[in-house]
Amino acid sequence: MSTILVVSGTGTEIGKTVVTAAVAAAARDCRVAVLKPAQTGLAPGEPGDAAEVARLAGSHVTAVELARFPEPLAPATAARRAGLAPVRPFEVAEAAQKLATEHDLVLVEGAGGLLVRFDDEGSTLADAARLLSAPVLVVAPAGLGTLNATALTAEALRSRGLDCRGVVIGSMPAEPDLASRCNIEDLPVAAGAPLLGAVPAGAGALPGADFAAGAARWLAPELGGSWAPGRR
């Protein structure tokens, strides 16, 4: 039976793509698909987040992008300014369900945070997750300020009846400061869900083979890895 997992985060530029790639790489014995509902800020032909996941994770990954908008804005704004049709949650759900018929694991990577709008009616990634009845993995920064943002994201999930599968730190410094070290213990409390990994800062710059080889060390057993809090 296929698994669909939605990957969201507390904001933008926090490591959602590298975390998605790590989860895909850790599932190396599975047929994995990565679905990017809305890619913004790239011109046609430029490699997007889904393609980057496939580059990092390996050849067992199928990369799919539903829509692309040229300006680096929220999907609803980018679609409106480009005069293009926005992405709708039902389209995301249908695409994920179709991929699930041919893959063991489908990862749906959102844009920005959980409640970034897909369209001018206010639809979000959370609506797609609800249509799919899929759990949500939250990617969070390591440092100061992450506890509040993580708690707000988890609260938004709970208020919509969605399952927060856990939290993964998207970019863990090689020499973490005091806040980052303390947050290893405090993030699960803020989220009401387990901390399931910490991807090292700069991992996305690794060659694909090195990234894929290291991914299991960065993720907890629940995500196919061997990571445990306190281990880097």
Write out the residue ranges for each language-model feature.
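Short internal beta-strands
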Residues: 36, 137-140, 165-171
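Charged helix-capping and loop-helix junction motifs
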Residues: 120-127, 151-154, 180-185
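Glycine-rich phosphate-binding P-loop
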Residues: 6-21
